[in-house]
Amino acid sequence: MPEPSSSSSPTMKPTLGLTGLTINAMALIAPGAFLWLTFQEQSLYGAPLAGCAMWFGIVCALLLCLATAVSYAELSKLYPGAGSSYFYAEQAFLSKTKAFKFARLAKFFTGWASHLYYWVYPGCMVGVTAILGGYLLNQFWPDTFSSTYDSPLFMILFCIVFSYGVAYIAFRGVTGTTAVNMAINIIQIAALVVFSIIAIAYRTKHTEGSVGYHLSNGVAVNYQVFQDTVKDDKGAPLPVLDANSKPTMDSAGKPVYQMADQTDKDGNPVPADANGKSTTVDKAAPFTLSYTVDQAYSKDSSGNVTFNFHPTAKSVIGPHSFNFVFIQACVAILILVGFESVTSMGEEAKNPKKDIPKAVVLSLVIQGAICYLFEYFAANYLLNSGYALPNAGASGSPIGDLMVITGTWLFGSYAAGRAFMLVQAFTVFLAMIGTTLACLSTGARVTYAMGRDDEVPSHFGLLHGRTLSPHRAIWTLATISAILGIVTVSCYLGGQSNPLAALDKHNIWYSFGIFSPEAYTKLPNTLLIITLISNFGTFLLYMTTCIVAIVAFREHHMFNGFKHLVVPVFGLLANLACMLFYLVGPWSVPGMSVKEPYIALGVAAVWGIYGWVYFVKKSKSTGKAVILTAKPAV
């Protein structure tokens, strides 16, 4: 392992035990935050059917991550020092009599691929937190901020402030970071359990035909609401479009027009009687819930099927379709990554050889296998005819909507339900601070490791004299995260199946960055693009790590056929399959857009080409051999 450039350079202090290491990894996974922040993305991509396999897709993604986690854990036993898989690759190849010649190449490829993940992921987190902030603005100032469109100006400003604010926490050092992460984990997991229990209780208490709640312009009510035809800017009624963007026809061959709930002068939903006519609340027809199969799956006039909700609990955990599972698994990778982050904290660990392997697996099992599977079951089971999956895909925060519904039912009023949602939103915001902090800190430490090794500019390999944090890498990553966060929010509503409602707020907060309602059916979803870029970096890193694990234990006295061959081979093939699926899936799976995955793949390809050019030029300028002819002196 390379030494610091100067013997007087400060080094990190070992302060973390098993609990501290596990907490830091758990902060990056953040199950309470990701349920809120990715449910819309998972509901929308692959619509109108792929959302039915959300829970099983997470199971498959979890198996992929567990295979990779085992590889990380085993490697950390051999090489407990700092640097994550970047140094694992070097040490694994250098330990072999023939493969040692590829040590520097393998090390650089691993580190460069990890940057596609570790540099993009924080930007994605900054962006989704800005979306959360935009959603909450409507809750506090509904007359100023739209319930459909988050303010572009606000989100841009938020991305800048949030990115540098979190970077400052990371700059202060790992000890403060661990304390913050522990507090945030306790709060968000408690909030997660509360919501999940309430969600399951709501579904079990509201049987077929019972009176339930739905949202009308964001307000939870249990009665029918008067509707009128939605019109465009010229006053013409807007038709309901099918999956092929063609007007839907009724049984008589006439167009079906979009309808919207109406409100009174105070912004309250206008009640409707059994005939759909406006009336008073005491005469309003009750809103009844349905879970029947014919309601769970609906067809338009062209025969296109849309999944709305799960008719039974068994349906929630079912795979439904191989293609749908792949779509959901490839997106779900975003919510599971982070377990490997503790391997970059080898220098901060008190007993790295013993504690890091345990922390890698523990963090994934606790949050992935327990928290995620429970909360995603609860959220999917809660869906019904009052709030279906298409509603979730068109919402800026579907989990926030569901919290309003369940809170209104449990506490007896919309005001109480809204307050319940705001409390939960606060815990999500805290979790996002912890998540962004953890991934930014991890990314900075990987860059620090490469900078200390002079594979990237050496100033990245310096530690701050007082805080002992890789300050150059942290502030650089903060700038990148702010930029990528802005890209994430620029068209986060793109890829809609149907046109959105027209913008109803016209002020400085919406002076730019808003497209026509129809444009959102054609524009790519930038949130999904950034997610997939990060995920492709993850797939490359995890594939490489599995290969490194195979190489490291080949002909080693600790070799175990299952842990060191079967498991990493499975992880390698599973990650590769996810990458390849995005090449072929858009051409064969209805509802899977070709735009987002191919843009993301293009970015990944450009990053790889640039990395190779940089590596070759750097090797020539420094006189380093790309292919080693002899093992370096220890």
Q: Which residues does each predicted region cover?
A:
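A generic transmembrane alpha-helix motif of multi-pass inner-membrane proteins
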Residues: 30, 38, 56, 188-191, ...
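Extracellular loop-to-transmembrane helix junctions
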Residues: 31-150, 154-158, 366, 599-611
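TM-loop-TM module centered on a large, flexible mid-protein loop between adjacent transmembrane helices
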Residues: 87-96, 103, 135-143, 220, ...
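Membrane-helix boundary/coupling elements in multi-pass transport proteins
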Residues: 81-85, 113-131, 331, 336-348, ...
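Membrane-interface "cap" regions at the ends of multi-pass membrane proteins
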Residues: 1-52, 65-66, 70, 101, ...
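Selective recognition of specific alpha-helical transmembrane segments in multi-pass small-molecule
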Residues: 26-33, 60-67, 72, 188-202, ...
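Hydrophobic alpha-helical segments and their helix-loop junctions in multi-pass secondary transporters
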Residues: 131-134, 186-236, 246, 254, ...
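Transmembrane alpha-helical segments of multi-pass small-molecule transport proteins
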Residues: 55-61, 107, 137-174, 189-195, ...
